[in-house]
Amino acid sequence: SGSCTVKTCWMRLPTFRTVGDFLKDRFDGASRVIYGNKGSNRASRMELHHLEPENPAHKPPSPHDLVYFEKSPNFCTYSGKTGTAGTAGRFCNSTSPALDGCELLCCGRGYRTRTQRVTERCNCTF
């Protein structure tokens, strides 16, 4: 017959791009927090510890906000303690706004440009 008596529902994950954009948005809005202490009343033991923004001018984080306790190491400079090599001496792309771009990779230190002329043989036909 042409009737349908069973319906199946399922949940589907969003696209990888959608998830990535969502996480990047949360990451860009993340704030540093400290562990606060509301008081010593034993009745409010569940609320004894809570997260407070490090900067009092910021609003307290919601359960959906991305927060962090420790600052990230400075990846621009060498550090044997954290194992970061730094970015000094690296090659960068002066026209790129991405991670390989000089503005980001050189950490505001400035950079030297080098123009190089390369002559190569090719199988060109005119």
Swiss-Prot record:
Cell compartments where the protein resides: Secreted, Extracellular space, Extracellular matrix; Secreted
One Gene Ontology cellular component annotation held by this UniProt entry: extracellular space
GO BP, sorted A to Z: canonical Wnt signaling pathway; cell fate commitment; neuron differentiation
Pfam families found in the cross-reference section: wnt (PF00110)
Similarity remark: Belongs to the Wnt family.
PANTHER family: PROTO-ONCOGENE WNT-1, WNT RELATED
Protein name (Swiss-Prot/TrEMBL): Protein Wnt-1
Species of the source: Pituophis melanoleucus
Name of the gene this protein is made from: WNT-1
